[in-house]
């Protein structure tokens, strides 16, 4: 079973930990709008940026769904955030071209992306926050308890996209486009035509719609595309080490040993 502490601990893994860094006014104290992320998991560049190119009015990419901006914190007085504009936060920053600058921010000022210059900045501290993994609600109203959104169990969009995939493989591109556009129309995204649709587009649409809900590996595995897509979009360590046989997972040895009526062969490569 689970209790009220399990999910906040899990969801903290997906949240950036900018609140812990002694930069731009943050001091390691969790605030209501920061949560208490530990950044154990960061989405890929493909997920954060690539699939949103030319997305137009797609509400799935709106700032309320994917928060891409960060702001200097308000001052904490007695555990309460106060809009004290007499405070100025001073942070030395070395830009990517080597220029040294001094960033001076008032509470509520935006922390500009060009000031995120270290690997630590972009990998753990200041990557976009997906509100599928967090809301502004906290257990018992305490910001250090993390963010706890409701989780979806069934999604009709998943059904449409599965059928679109089936239509495409059956040669019915018109039916596939219609199903994909049903999902996109709900999201206020621009509609597509048959010339734009292929299996990669359907996978992109699944990512936009079902991030954090579907098991992406299982989707790619049944398509026999784990190797191909990891090589194309995975981070360096994953792309360098993955092998074609990794499209399938190994069969547990206990399952092989317990199958007494016939020989159960291990998947190739394991």
Give names to the regions the model predicted.
Residues 88-146, 224-228:
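Extended glycan-interaction surfaces of carbohydrate-active proteins
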